[in-house]
Amino acid sequence: MVKEFVQDEEKQRLLLDEHTEKHFTAGEVVRDIIIGVSDGLTVPFALAAGLSGANAPSALVLTAGLAEVAAGAISMGLGGYLAAKSDADHYHRELQREQEEIDTVPDTEAAEIADILSQYGLGPEEYGPVVNSLRSNPKAWLEFMMKFELGLEKPEPRRALMSAGTIALAYVVGGLVPLLPYMFVPTADRAMATSVVVTLAALLFFGYVKGRFTGNRPFISAFQTAVIGALASAAAFGMAKAVQSI
């Protein structure tokens, strides 16, 4: 038997204070980190493997790799900024359009509220007071329509800059991993072998952590991430060897 909800604000507040949500809510930040680190680990790794396949000395591999990391971080960060800015612009355009509809056709918009609530199993006698309450509060009405009709969340004001910085920094951190051996190992062959071991270990670790955060199976995620990185570097190495033999 379902217990009735008691409309006691003080009791509700106590219940909410006692309950700790276990949902992970920093999805956008994690997404940016995943994008930056995954590309940062893979692209410089493939570049270093390709140059090593062409018998380039460690100094050249390191120089080219660092240049790629710098360019990649700027490019990825700019891409993240533009994507977040585009999302914010889209939200504000829809916000303005929805406000105009509330002002010009309020009855139609109220009917849409009723339709949305009816999809959750509420009858007219139940959603009627909710519709009337929202109509008396224009700000809440607009927020309700944006969230439940259009499925749009209000973006954070600094989201674009945060996304750009997070992706760029994550790319640099990931990109330095495959290049570290070339800083300390003088011969290119040994540096490449060390880079392969270090980067594959980093890819496995990153894939495992990514799986834990995203709710996927960690070991499957680790394996998939490592395979993608290995295939990219192997393709670059093989291409360099093929071109060199021509």
Swiss-Prot record:
Protein name: Vacuolar iron transporter 2
Family: Belongs to the CCC1 family.
Binding positions (Fe cation 1): 98, 101, 109, 112, 149
GO BP: intracellular iron ion homeostasis; intracellular manganese ion homeostasis
Protein function: Vacuolar iron transporter involved in the transfer of iron ions from the cytosol to the vacuole for intracellular iron storage. Vacuolar iron storage is required for seed embryo and seedling development. May be involved in the regulation of iron translocation between flag leaves and seeds. Can transport zinc ions from the cytosol to the vacuole.
Domain comment in the entry: The cytoplasmic metal binding domain (MBD) is located between transmembrane 2 (TM2) and transmembrane 3 (TM3).
Region (Cytoplasmic metal binding domain (MBD)): 86-161
Catalytic activity: Fe(2+)(in) = Fe(2+)(out)
Keywords (A to Z) from UniProt: Ion transport, Iron, Iron transport, Membrane, Metal-binding, Transmembrane, Transmembrane helix, Transport, Vacuole
Signal peptide annotation: none
Membrane protein topology class: Multi-pass membrane protein
Name of encoding gene: VIT2
Coiled coil regions in record: none
Ranges in the topological domain labelled Cytoplasmic: 1-32, 80-164, 212-218
Superkingdom of source: Eukaryota
GO cellular component: vacuolar membrane
Cellular location(s): Vacuole membrane
Any one GO MF annotation of this record: iron ion transmembrane transporter activity
Residues annotated to bind Fe cation 3: 101, 109, 112
Organism the protein comes from: Oryza sativa subsp. japonica
Binding annotation for Fe cation 2: 98, 109, 112, 145
Induction entry: Induced by treatment with iron in roots and shoots. Down-regulated under iron deficiency in roots and shoots. Down-regulated by treatment with zinc in roots and shoots.
Statement: the UniProt record of this protein carries the keyword Iron-sulfur: no
